[in-house]
Amino acid sequence: MTKIKFTKMHGNGNDFIVIDEFENPVPEEKKAAFAKKVCHRRFGIGADGVLFLAKPLHTSLHMRIFNEDGSEAEMCGNGIRCFVKYAVDNGHMNPGKDKVETKAGILEVEARIEDGKTLVKVSMGKPLFDPKKIPAAGLNNFINKPLHGYEVTAVNTGVPHAVIFVDDVNAVDLMKVAPEIRYDLKTFPKGINVNFVQREGHNLRVRTYERGVEGETLSCGTGSVASAAVARYLGYTRDETTVYTAGGQLNISFVSDIAYMEGPAETVYEGEIDVDFSAL
């Protein structure tokens, strides 16, 4: 048995297990199985994903995220905020501006303390509507195309997202209708996250079905950015908007088409778990 220290964190209810690989390296070939084990909410610690804080490949701290099904994601908006808070709290990073390396690229981040809470702002890059970058079927941007009874717009904000505007997000049977779009591999070859969005003036209310979690999460950072990006593209919102989710709110802004996300990150508790890597 190997003792692995962990920190349980959440960003607006989207919860993660942080593993500091400076102290607790997890074998590369075991990461997927480890994530599935510890994320299980009955037989493990319980989380939407595992964040591995790794030694930098270049000049930045390196974040890797594995979903609860063991798949590795390119990026996670709520996850990177938790990652930055952990890094600041544990001396890997100073408050203020820095960079984090992810599979989606190197992202600029900024951590600040306000009323005793850690807020993290992340430069999420330019939302990509090119179907080759999502990926999605077709040669033209995937904008308001009819699919499974809805008008769907697709965009990549680090990971692929489908965005659907409805009158009332709470009236949507998310677990019934979202998987039809998420698993439409003819349209979205790598699968896609699915967001149902309700307009509230220039702000948005969002529910997200997450790929890899295979269910609804209380909040999705990249989904909030995707929803704001599509709303802006369609002329529904301006350069700044607040996105409300079941887990809390995120402030999304755009400067020269670059998306910025700001929101909280919180530590829940710390602990140790015994892991038999030979059995994984």
Swiss-Prot record:
Q: Which UniProt keywords apply?
A: Amino-acid biosynthesis, Cytoplasm, Isomerase, Lysine biosynthesis
Gene3D superfamilies membership: Diaminopimelate Epimerase, Chain A, domain 1
Protein name (Swiss-Prot/TrEMBL): Diaminopimelate epimerase
Q: What is its EC number?
A: 5.1.1.7
An example Gene Ontology cellular component term from the record?
Answer: cytosol
Q: Which PROSITE patterns match?
A: DAP_EPIMERASE (PS01326)
Q: Which GO terms describe its molecular function?
A: diaminopimelate epimerase activity
Q: In which pathway does it act?
A: Amino-acid biosynthesis; L-lysine biosynthesis via DAP pathway; DL-2,6-diaminopimelate from LL-2,6-diaminopimelate: step 1/1
Gene name, per UniProt, is dapF
* Predominant place of localization: cytoplasm
Biological role stated in the UniProt entry: Catalyzes the stereoinversion of LL-2,6-diaminopimelate (L,L-DAP) to meso-diaminopimelate (meso-DAP), a precursor of L-lysine.
Give the residues annotated as coiled coil.
Answer: none
Q: Show which residues form the site (Could be important to modulate the pK values of the two catalytic cysteine residues).
A: H161, E210
Q: Where in the cell is it found?
A: Cytoplasm
HAMAP family recorded: DAP_epimerase (MF_00197)
